[in-house]
Regions:
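Metal-dependent nuclease catalytic cores that hydrolyze phosphodiester bonds in DNA/RNA
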Residues: 1-204
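Single, functionally critical "micro-switch" positions that shape active/binding sites
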Residues: 56, 207, 250
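Hydrophobic/aromatic-lined pockets within catalytic cores
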Residues: 60-65, 211, 226-229, 255-259
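Short catalytic/ligand-binding loop motif for oxyanion handling, primarily in non-cytosolic enzymes
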Residues: 68-69, 80, 230-231, 282-284
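Metal-dependent nuclease catalytic regions and adjoining charged, substrate-binding loops involved
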Residues: 98, 105, 239-244, 249-345
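Short regulatory "switch" loops immediately downstream of catalytic or recognition motifs
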Residues: 165-175, 212-214, 251-261
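Secondary-structure boundary elements
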Residues: 181-183, 211-219, 255-268
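Non-catalytic protein-protein interaction segments used by genome-maintenance enzymes to assemble
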Residues: 192-244
Length: 345
């Protein structure tokens, strides 16, 4: 029996993140923001919700040792997501010269607050500076002490642990995170990375989990999602954050990696499963996406067209090599566009 690990791209996570191959996150962000924001397309995005999801993922699939290497749990006054984001931004840009928040120039603090639309009205300028200095100083200092580790509050850690414990014990999800010594034909692996090409363009992915049934020759791709909405409402998040791109891209890459392998070439990749949990309701649900082999655009319940990742990738590849100031649509129409979004009432 050959392990699926032998086909994986064996690099550490920093190497994976730094690689130039296009990922799901890049494609989905490009589709949301458009080609005029290419200059910031590859910038790392950090939000409290992403941090929480990463913490659950790490503790659940990599274990406590890996969690302790990446995160530090501290007790500090509760902050809103906006204040946390502002503090992280200030720390990222000023920590080398300012170990404390209080030494940063007020104008820079105000500028950072405006970036996150925090009391953006000009009449609140003094208040927003004062509020950030009073509320965020302790958290800023903790970020300095933490170094390369990510700071989690005690409350966040309690929620992380609750989610992990529930996922490991809930009848709907415990199978994914447990092993049966009598099922030697079942292989469960976490955080495997793969790399392939589409029409000469490098693409990459990292699976939260892959389950391989070596007897039935079936491969089950699985992803863990933490959500701010009730688990039953995941379909809205699925289309909003374009998880169809993730499922279809990852399936394509995995298929490319197994198709020429003598052992795995006859294995069949199954529908993509998303394990969804909310930190408040803590009632995990497994959502199944059967369109992961699809190659056509999709339409969501609101009528929005969800372009196939291949079309997005080709467009992104064009703009990454393009130095002009016009869109593809404008160029194709000689810079004459028709207003067509209005209809008679």
């Amino acid at each position: 029996m050959k392990s699926i690990r032998e086909l994986a791209w064996s690099v550490d996570e920093p190497t994976y993140r730094a690689d130039s191959a296009i990922s799901y996150s890049t494609l989905s962000r490009f589709e949301r923001e458009g080609w005029r924001k290419l200059s910031s397309l590859f910038d790392k995005i950090e939000t409290p919700s992403l941090t929480f999801g990463s913490a659950v993922d790490t503790k659940l699939t990599d274990g406590d040792e890996a969690f302790n290497e990446r995160f530090i749990v501290c007790d500090f006054p509760p902050l809103s997501d906006t204040l946390i984001s502002i503090t992280k931004f200030l720390h990222k840009n000023f920590h080398e010269d300012h170990r404390r928040l209080s030494t940063i120039d007020d104008a820079e603090i105000s500028k950072a607050a405006l970036m996150f639309n925090y009391y953006a009205n000009s009449k609140y300028e003094n208040f927003r500076i004062k509020s950030i200095k009073e509320s965020c100083s302790e958290y800023y200092s903790l970020l300095t002490l933490a170094g390369d580790k990510t700071v989690l509050s005690q409350n966040d850690y309690a929620d992380v642990k609750a989610c992990v414990d529930e996922l490991k014990t809930n009848p709907a999800t415990k199978y994914f995170f447990s092993s049966n010594p009598f099922e030697t034909h079942i292989e469960k692996v976490f955080q495997l990375k793969f790399r392939a090409e589409f029409q000469g363009i490098p693409v990459r992915c990292m699976f939260d989990e892959i389950i391989v049934d070596h007897e039935k020759k079936m491969i089950y791709p699985i992803d863990l999602k933490t959500t701010g909405h009730p688990e039953e409402e995941f379909e809205g998040s699925f289309s909003q954050w374009r998880y169809d791109i993730q499922a279809k891209l990852y399936t394509y890459i995995l298929q490319e990696c197994i198709k020429n392998d003598e052992y795995f070439k006859d294995f069949k990749i199954q529908s993509y499963q998303f394990i969804v949990i909310n930190r408040r309701t803590v009632a995990p649900i497994v959502w199944v996406f059967e369109g992961n082999f699809g190659q056509v655009d999709l339409k969501d319940g609101k009528g929005n067209i969800l372009r196939d990742w291949r079309n997005i990738l080709n467009e992104l590849h064009y703009y990454l090599r393009y130095a002009g100031k016009y869109s593809i649509r404008a160029m194709e129409n000689n810079c004459v566009l028709k207003i067509s979004n209005l209809t008679p009432c």
